Amino acid sequence: MIATGKIIQIIGAVVDVEFDQNSVPKIYNALEVKNKKIQLILEVQQQLGAGIVRTIAMGSTNGLKRGLIVIDLGHYIKVPVGQATLGRIINVLGKTIDNKGPLKNLDNSKLEYWEIHRSAPSYQEQASSQEILETGIKVIDLICPFSKGGKVGLFGGAGVGKTVNMMELIRNIAIEHSGYSVFTGVGERTREGNDFYHEMKDSKVLDKVSLVYGQMNEPPGNRLRVAFTGLTIAEKFRDEGRDVLLFIDNIYRYTLAGTEVSALLGRMPSAVGYQPTLAEEMGLLQERITSTKEGSITSVQAVYVPADDLTDPSPATTFAHLDSTVTLSRQIAALGIYPAIDPLNSTSRQLDPYIVGDEHYDTARGVQSILQRYQELKDIIAILGMDELSQEDKILVSRARKIQRFLSQPFFVAEVFTGFPGKYVSLKDNIRAFKGIIGGEFDNLPEQAFYMVGTIEEVIKKAKLL
């Protein structure tokens, strides 16, 4: 029998509903407001006793009033999964928001629905891989390589290029990699979502991407759950035996939505005002993003860093779950070097001679040691000038500046801004070029020739024109 209740209190996105004491809904159950004018789903967060449950609205509570009838659907929020979602934009509840009509399977078979709250795969079901996933972005492939089935975080403050880097990764991997991708926009700008849709359409990869959006203007409950909707779609593809790419932009907004919900529910805040359940909420999401014996989920997550402070509880909690961290630096962006990835602050578990091989490992560490030494010499250069350096250090500084410029790269998705055609650089060419710079093969070339190019052949060609 369907349990019905009525709304007794509305405070913003929090709605209290009273049920009969013998039919109180379970935690996380979906409730539906029965009204012709209002289509609203609520999710149970707390049982307050005396048959009253406290819920969070998944949409706007405008027009709600006390006394409205609410139905317990008897299950968690369910969303459509499978190939019907490819090339479409859906919201947290699985409803289409791209004005292209309802979702349907190509063979007109019945849509499959999965609940968004699911258990993470057991230890026995999980599988790990050490296969490297080539991205075509020089600095990433060299310094912080991605693994197939791994988790990657793009860390950066406001406006240093997290979304552009993510769009380039999707474009490169989705074109080179034949599998499916799921893009989940959590609390980001609607304009970015629109740009992204058109970018995928122009790159002709839209039919391989499922888009799930919960933008900045949505209520906190919606932004808190939209990541689970995207993840559930990715899990379905993985369980069909596919290798899936899951992109989440932005994990910080997921944390922030949790903070808002926590405050609305009256919980005592912890450090810096975050929710006391921050680590648990992050774990609930991250533990499900994993590879099994059936298929893999490789995830790339943008992480906004408040005030460029990597020790803030939100990015700090995310660090623990990642295999590779790509750190974007405002100082590098200020030099006009894009992508503004900091090679000294970015790390990867895959950068191990047993996984990537000795040549790759030695080249990456050689690049880092030269850049580190250049960093140390910067103060001396600023105070005393280049003339006070030893001959050895002068050569090192020259190579470091070439490396720094050669780590820049024109992106396909940023062609309209940079005016340079995008470049995809293979790992083999990448290692060969940096090995040559470290070894002094290109000491005679001017450093300007290394800026905004792809391969070392382009540098040589550009140097002849200078």
From Swiss-Prot:
Q: What class of enzyme is it?
A: translocase
One function term, GO molecular function aspect? proton-transporting ATP synthase activity, rotational mechanism
Location comes to: Cell membrane
User: What's the EC number here?
Assistant: 7.1.2.2
A Gene Ontology cellular component where this protein is annotated is: plasma membrane
Catalyses:
ATP + H2O + 4 H(+)(in) = ADP + phosphate + 5 H(+)(out)
Q: Which residues bind ATP?
A: 156-163
Look up the domain of life of the source.
Answer: Bacteria
Stated membrane topology is: Peripheral membrane protein
Matching entries from SMART domains are given as: AAA (SM00382)
Question: What InterPro entries does this protein map onto?
Answer: AAA+_ATPase, ATP-synt_VA_C, ATP_synth_F1_bsu, ATPase_a/bsu_AS, ATPase_alpha/beta_chains, ATPase_F1/V1/A1_a/bsu_N, ATPase_F1/V1/A1_a/bsu_N_sf, ATPase_F1/V1/A1_a/bsu_nucl-bd
Q: Which UniProt keywords apply?
A: ATP synthesis, ATP-binding, Cell membrane, CF(1), Hydrogen ion transport, Ion transport, Membrane, Nucleotide-binding, Translocase, Transport
Q: Subunit composition? A: F-type ATPases have 2 components, CF(1) - the catalytic core - and CF(0) - the membrane proton channel. CF(1) has five subunits: alpha(3), beta(3), gamma(1), delta(1), epsilon(1). CF(0) has three main subunits: a(1), b(2) and c(9-12). The alpha and beta chains form an alternating ring which encloses part of the gamma chain. CF(1) is attached to CF(0) by a central stalk formed by the gamma and epsilon chains, while a peripheral stalk is formed by the delta and b chains.
Task performed by this protein: Produces ATP from ADP in the presence of a proton gradient across the membrane. The catalytic sites are hosted primarily by the beta subunits.
Instruction: Tell me which family the UniProt entry assigns to this protein.
Output: Belongs to the ATPase alpha/beta chains family.
* NCBIfam families in the cross-refs: atpD
* Name the record gives this protein: ATP synthase subunit beta
What organism, scientifically named, is this protein from? Buchnera aphidicola subsp. Schizaphis graminum (strain Sg)
